[in-house]
Amino acid sequence: MSEKKKTINAFMLIVLLFGLISLFTAYPLSNGDEGFHMAKSYSMFSETFPRETSEKRLREIELIAISQPKQISIRKFYGEKIKSVANDGIKFNVLTDQNLTSKIDVGHFFPAIGILIGRLIYPSYGVMLFSARLFNLIFFLGGMYLIFRRAKFDHLIFLMIFTVPFMQKIASPSYDIFAFLAVAAFGTNFLYLSQLKKVSDVRKE
């Protein structure tokens, strides 16, 4: 096994372990605007847009979840079935975001799939959030692995250090994961291109 592959595998293992710890131990809706991201993700595959999954309602629950002392019931959060969610149909909706150049929100796609699968398994806040976190973690790991494979060995340390500040977000439904992967991919290509003497040296891969 090459030195580069060993380095990649070791780092991915560390990220996986950190992500799994965060997945199971991070308090519900406490990982940076999770109420907002959960509401956006849910709406991507919703037919009736239940009030219980609206941004307003999830923000209210998030405020309770991050308050001191903690006032949210973990058992109820995971175990209580939401009737309106159980009765909701599945319809794909294109989400928009005026802050994006394309105006189309693609950053919530993977957590949206996670929430959809979560509500099909058991329509509770906890199960949906757990599934969304899991899918974003898988997306992050897969994306970073592909980026690392394409990167030169001397760029890996830079990318790994760059990853550290975002570690707390890798198991959350946030669109920050999508943005981070885009920036990491851009950084990898930029570092590669900056070392070329002429444009014709660009590898055709």
Where are these regions (language model features)?
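Membrane-interface junctions at the ends of membrane-embedded or membrane-associated helices
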Residues: 1-5, 191-205
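Start-transfer (signal-anchor) and selected internal transmembrane alpha helices
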Residues: 1-22, 29
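Membrane-embedded helix bundles of polyisoprenyl
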Residues: 15, 137, 154-170, 177-194, ...
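Aromatic- and kink-enriched transmembrane "portal" helix at the membrane-lumen/periplasm boundary
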Residues: 101, 105-109, 124-133, 140, ...
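Hydrophobic transmembrane alpha-helices
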Residues: 115, 144-149, 183-196
